[in-house]
């Protein structure tokens, strides 16, 4: 991934500079999250965008049809540049790097939360308060994902700190304790 980061960083930094100048950094951060969701959810879209067979103009037309009206001109211009330079393979790395730089600039802490099932709005709000207390700031960006292998509960990763409140984690710890006892 270091090579991809070295490719992604200049694009992400340029996007951050442009969005700062236009006062749309927060809006673009939200759009990056939405675009990443589309990218990760649609294998066909992802395959088409990274295909060397599809011409850059065709990729730009597809991007315009899919997200052209839903993103700021700054983001759409970045997408066009990535298509022109055959760099859409680094799309997700660029979006993730932008989000990293944005959080760093704004002093926002990233908390990754994996839960066994989707959380309700009330559960998300309660978890958000707990994570903010753990982080010591109310500037926390929570990345929620569902991981059925947890069986129940959740795992919170906040920097180097990991809180495993999952059923699979409890079973694993119990197994280790039993192994030590025997």
From Swiss-Prot:
<comment type="function">
    <text>F(1)F(0) ATP synthase produces ATP from ADP in the presence of a proton or sodium gradient. F-type ATPases consist of two structural domains, F(1) containing the extramembraneous catalytic core and F(0) containing the membrane proton channel, linked together by a central stalk and a peripheral stalk. During catalysis, ATP synthesis in the catalytic domain of F(1) is coupled via a rotary mechanism of the central stalk subunits to proton translocation.</text>
</comment>
<keyword id="KW-0066">ATP synthesis</keyword>
<keyword id="KW-0813">Transport</keyword>
<dbReference type="GO" id="GO:0031676">
    <property type="term" value="C:plasma membrane-derived thylakoid membrane"/>
</dbReference>
<dbReference type="InterPro" id="IPR000711">
    <property type="entry name" value="ATPase_OSCP/dsu"/>
</dbReference>
<protein>
    <recommendedName>
        <fullName>ATP synthase subunit delta</fullName>
    </recommendedName>
</protein>
<keyword id="KW-0793">Thylakoid</keyword>
<dbReference type="InterPro" id="IPR026015">
    <property type="entry name" value="ATP_synth_OSCP/delta_N_sf"/>
</dbReference>
<keyword id="KW-0375">Hydrogen ion transport</keyword>
<dbReference type="GO" id="GO:0046933">
    <property type="term" value="F:proton-transporting ATP synthase activity, rotational mechanism"/>
</dbReference>
<keyword id="KW-0406">Ion transport</keyword>
<comment type="function">
    <text>This protein is part of the stalk that links CF(0) to CF(1). It either transmits conformational changes from CF(0) to CF(1) or is implicated in proton conduction.</text>
</comment>
<comment type="subunit">
    <text>F-type ATPases have 2 components, F(1) - the catalytic core - and F(0) - the membrane proton channel. F(1) has five subunits: alpha(3), beta(3), gamma(1), delta(1), epsilon(1). CF(0) has four main subunits: a(1), b(1), b'(1) and c(10-14). The alpha and beta chains form an alternating ring which encloses part of the gamma chain. F(1) is attached to F(0) by a central stalk formed by the gamma and epsilon chains, while a peripheral stalk is formed by the delta, b and b' chains.</text>
</comment>
<comment type="similarity">
    <text>Belongs to the ATPase delta chain family.</text>
</comment>
<dbReference type="Pfam" id="PF00213">
    <property type="entry name" value="OSCP"/>
</dbReference>
<keyword id="KW-0472">Membrane</keyword>
<dbReference type="GO" id="GO:0045259">
    <property type="term" value="C:proton-transporting ATP synthase complex"/>
</dbReference>
<keyword id="KW-0139">CF(1)</keyword>
């Amino acid at each position: 991934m270091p090579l991809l980061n070295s490719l992604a960083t200049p694009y992400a930094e340029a996007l951050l500079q442009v969005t700062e100048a236009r006062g749309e950094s927060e809006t673009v951060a939200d759009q990056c999250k939405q675009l990443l969701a589309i990218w990760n959810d649609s294998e066909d879209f992802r395959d088409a965008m990274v295909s060397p067979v599809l011409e850059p103009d065709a990729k730009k037309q597809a991007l315009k049809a899919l997200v052209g009206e839903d993103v700021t001109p700054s983001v759409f211009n970045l997408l066009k540049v990535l298509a022109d330079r055959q760099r859409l393979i680094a799309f997700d790395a660029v979006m993730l790097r932008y989000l990293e730089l944005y959080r760093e600039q704004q002093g926002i802490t990233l908390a990754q939360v994996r839960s066994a099932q989707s959380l309700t709005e009330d559960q998300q709000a309660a978890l958000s308060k707990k994570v903010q207390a753990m982080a010591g700031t109310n500037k926390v960006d929570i990345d929620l994902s569902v991981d059925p292998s947890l069986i129940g509960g959740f795992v919170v990763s906040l920097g180097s700190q990991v809180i495993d409140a999952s059923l699979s984690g409890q079973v694993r710890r119990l197994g280790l304790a039993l192994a030590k006892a025997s």
